[in-house]
C-alpha cells in the first residue's frame, strides 16, 4: 500500500515539473540562447586579432556624421556683401592681344578685421570703442568705421555718424594694432536722452576696392534707465577718487615680495582717496595674488584677468589696448589718472605732499614724470650684511645710475576727462596743455628688472657713496630707502601681519 502511494506521489511531481517548464518555455529558450552565444564568444575570443577594437571614437564618428547633417542657424550682418563670402575661382585666360590674364583669389583670414574689447560712453553724445585690428590693414590699407545707435524705443529712428579712429601704439604694433574709435554724434545734443535704452553698433569696413567687406558689431548695450547723465557734468558730480592708477599688462614669474613692497608704498603715497587697477596677463600667480588679496578685500585694488588677449599678437601683451580700456572705463571716476609700472616708485620732495603737487599742476591736462634709474643688483650695506639681507628691497637698493644718456623714458599722469586716447609714456590725443618740467615736483625711481627676480636682489654689497659696477657709475641715493620703515609700519597697521612670510 505504501509503495502505491509513493508511485502516485512521484507521478504528481513529474507532472508538476512538466507544467512549470511548459508555462515558461519561451523564457527558458531565450536563456539557453544567451548562454549559447556567450559560450561561443568565449570560445572564439582567443582567435580574434589584437588590433581589432571598438572605441568611443568609433561611436563619436557615427554621431558626428549624423549631427553634421543637421544645419546650424547663423545670423550674418551684411553691408554690400556677406562678411564671410565664398570666393569664386577665376581661371587664367588669354586676352585678345595675347597677354595671359592671371587671377588671384583670397581664402580665409590672416587676422581679424576688428577684435572688440570694450566700449564706454564718453559724454552725453559720444562713445569710445577699444579693440584691436590688423596692423598691415591700417598701415597699408584704408579701413573705416561707422557708428550707429539703435534705440530700444521703436518710435526712434536709428542714427549714425562716422567713427574717428585713433591709432595709439606709435608704430609698436605686431600682427595687431590698438584702435580707439571715437563715435561722436555731433548732430544731436544727446544720445538716448529719454534713457529708454539702446545699442551702439560699430560697422568696420576693410576698404578692399574689389570686395569691400563690412563687419557689424554690437559693442555696447544700455538698458533702460541705466545712464546717469549727471556723471558727464563735472560741475554736478563729485569724483569717487582723487587718484587712480592704471597698470599695464603683468606677465611672467613676478616676485611676490617686490609686488608687496610696491603696493604698500603707493597705497600710503596716494592716500585714502586712491585706487589701483591691475591687469593680469599671466603674471598674477598664486603667491602674487596672496599679496594683493588683503588690498582687494579693503577695496583699494581691482584686478582684471586679461589672459585671453594673448590669442591676439600685439605689442607687449597688448599694453596699448589695456591702458586705453582703463582710461575710458574709469574716465569719470577720478580727477587724476597715473600710468607707470610696478618696478617704478613715485616720490615728491619731503616738504611736499602728492595733494599739494597735484594742486600746483591743475591747469595742465597732462604732465610727464622724470626717471631716476636705480640698480636692481647692488645694495648699500650701511648696517652690515646680516641686517641688510633682512630688509625690504627698497630699503637697500640705494644706488642710482648716473651714466649720461641722450634721454630716458618718462611716465605721466592725466586729467582723464580731457583725454581721448593714451599711450605708454604719454598721451598725444588730448585737449589742454602738457607740462614736461615737473622734475622739481615729482619723480619716479625705476628698479628695472627687479620685479621679475625670484631671489634676493643684492648681488653685491657696497658701503661707498660712489661705485662703478660693470662699467656703469653709480651714486648713493637713499631717497626711497629713507621711507622704507614707514612703509613697513603702514602695511602692518593697515592689513596686519598676514604677509610677513612672503617669499622673494
UniProtKB/Swiss-Prot annotation:
Class in the EC hierarchy, top level: transferase
Tissue: Expressed in root caps, mature leaves, top of the stems and seeds.
Pfam families in the cross-refs: Glyco_transf_92 (PF01697)
The UniProt record lists the keyword Transferase: yes
Record EC number: 2.4.1.-
Gene Ontology CC annotations of this record: Golgi membrane
Keywords: Cell wall biogenesis/degradation, Glycosyltransferase, Golgi apparatus, Membrane, Transferase, Transmembrane, Transmembrane helix
GO biological process: cell wall biogenesis; cell wall organization
Residue ranges of domain GT92 in the record: 242-456
Keyword RNA-binding recorded: no
Domain of life (superkingdom): Eukaryota
InterPro entries linked: Glyco_transf_92
Record localization: Golgi apparatus membrane
Transmembrane spans: 30-50
Molecular function terms, GO-annotated: glycosyltransferase activity
Main location: Golgi
Consequences of knocking out this gene: No visible phenotype under normal growth conditions, but mutant plants have reduced content of beta-1,4-galactan in leaf cell wall.
Protein topology in the membrane: Single-pass membrane protein
Family: Belongs to the glycosyltransferase 92 family.
Described function: Involved in the biosynthesis of beta-1,4-galactan. Beta-1,4-galactans are abundant polysaccharides in plant cell walls and are found as side-chain of rhamnogalacturonan I, which is a major component of pectin.
Record-given protein name: Galactan beta-1,4-galactosyltransferase GALS3
Organism of origin: Arabidopsis thaliana (Mouse-ear cress)
Amino acid at each position: 500500500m505504501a509503495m502505491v502511494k509513493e508511485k502516485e506521489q512521484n507521478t504528481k511531481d513529474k507532472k508538476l515539473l512538466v507544467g512549470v517548464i511548459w508555462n515558461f518555455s519561451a523564457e527558458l529558450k531565450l536563456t539557453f540562447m544567451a548562454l549559447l552565444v556567450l559560450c561561443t564568444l568565449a570560445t572564439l575570443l582567443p582567435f580574434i586579432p589584437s588590433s581589432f577594437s571598438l572605441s568611443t571614437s568609433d561611436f563619436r564618428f557615427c554621431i558626428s556624421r549624423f549631427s553634421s547633417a543637421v544645419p546650424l542657424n547663423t545670423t550674418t550682418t551684411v553691408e554690400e556683401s556677406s562678411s564671410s563670402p565664398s570666393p569664386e575661382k577665376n581661371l587664367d585666360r588669354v586676352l585678345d592681344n595675347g597677354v595671359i590674364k592671371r587671377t588671384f583669389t583670397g581664402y580665409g583670414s590672416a587676422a581679424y578685421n576688428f577684435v572688440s574689447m570694450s566700449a564706454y560712453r564718453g559724454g552725453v553724445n559720444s562713445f569710445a570703442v577699444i579693440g584691436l585690428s590688423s596692423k598691415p590693414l591700417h598701415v597699408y590699407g584704408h579701413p573705416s568705421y561707422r557708428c550707429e545707435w539703435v534705440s530700444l524705443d521703436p518710435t526712434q529712428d536709428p542714427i549714425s555718424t562716422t567713427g574717428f579712429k585713433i591709432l595709439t601704439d606709435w608704430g609698436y604694433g605686431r600682427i595687431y594694432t590698438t584702435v580707439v574709435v571715437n563715435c561722436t554724434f555731433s548732430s544731436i545734443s544727446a544720445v538716448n536722452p529719454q534713457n529708454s535704452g539702446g545699442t551702439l553698433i560699430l560697422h568696420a569696413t576693410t576698404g578692399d576696392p574689389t570686395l569691400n567687406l563690412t563687419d557689424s558689431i554690437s559693442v555696447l548695450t544700455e538698458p533702460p534707465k541705466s545712464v546717469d547723465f549727471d556723471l558727464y557734468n563735472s560741475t554736478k558730480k563729485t569724483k569717487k577718487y582723487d587718484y587712480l592708477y592704471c597698470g599695464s599688462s603683468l606677465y611672467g614669474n613676478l616676485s611676490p615680495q617686490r609686488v608687496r613692497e610696491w603696493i604698500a608704498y603707493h597705497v600710503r603715497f596716494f592716500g585714502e582717496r586712491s585706487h589701483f587697477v591691475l591687469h593680469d596677463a599671466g603674471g598674477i600667480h598664486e603667491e602674487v595674488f596672496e599679496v594683493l588679496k588683503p588690498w582687494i578685500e579693503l577695496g583699494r585694488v581691482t584686478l582684471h584677468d586679461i589672459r585671453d588677449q594673448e590669442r591676439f599678437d600685439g605689442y607687449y601683451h597688448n599694453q596699448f589696448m589695456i591702458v586705453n580700456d582703463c582710461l575710458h572705463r574709469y574716465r569719470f571716476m577720478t580727477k587724476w589718472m597715473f600710468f607707470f609700472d610696478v618696478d617704478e616708485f613715485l616720490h615728491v620732495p619731503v616738504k611736499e605732499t602728492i595733494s599739494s603737487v597735484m594742486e600746483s599742476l591743475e591747469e595742465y591736462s597732462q604732465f610727464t614724470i622724470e626717471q631716476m634709474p636705480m640698480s636692481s643688483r647692488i645694495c648699500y650695506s650701511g648696517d652690515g650684511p646680516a641686517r641688510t639681507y633682512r630688509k625690504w628691497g627698497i630699503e637697500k637698493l640705494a644706488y642710482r645710475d648716473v651714466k649720461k644718456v641722450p634721454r630716458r623714458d618718462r611716465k605721466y599722469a592725466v586729467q582723464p576727462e580731457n583725454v581721448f586716447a593714451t599711450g605708454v609714456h604719454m598721451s598725444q590725443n588730448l585737449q589742454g596743455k602738457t607740462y614736461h618740467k615737473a622734475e622739481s615736483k615729482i619723480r619716479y625711481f625705476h628698479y628695472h628688472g627687479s620685479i621679475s627676480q625670484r631671489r634676493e636682489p643684492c648681488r653685491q654689497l657696497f658701503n661707498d657713496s660712489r661705485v662703478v659696477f660693470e662699467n656703469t657709475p653709480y651714486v648713493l641715493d637713499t631717497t626711497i630707502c629713507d621711507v622704507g620703515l614707514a612703509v613697513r609700519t603702514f602695511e602692518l597697521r593697515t592689513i596686519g601681519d598676514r604677509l610677513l612670510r612672503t617669499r622673494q
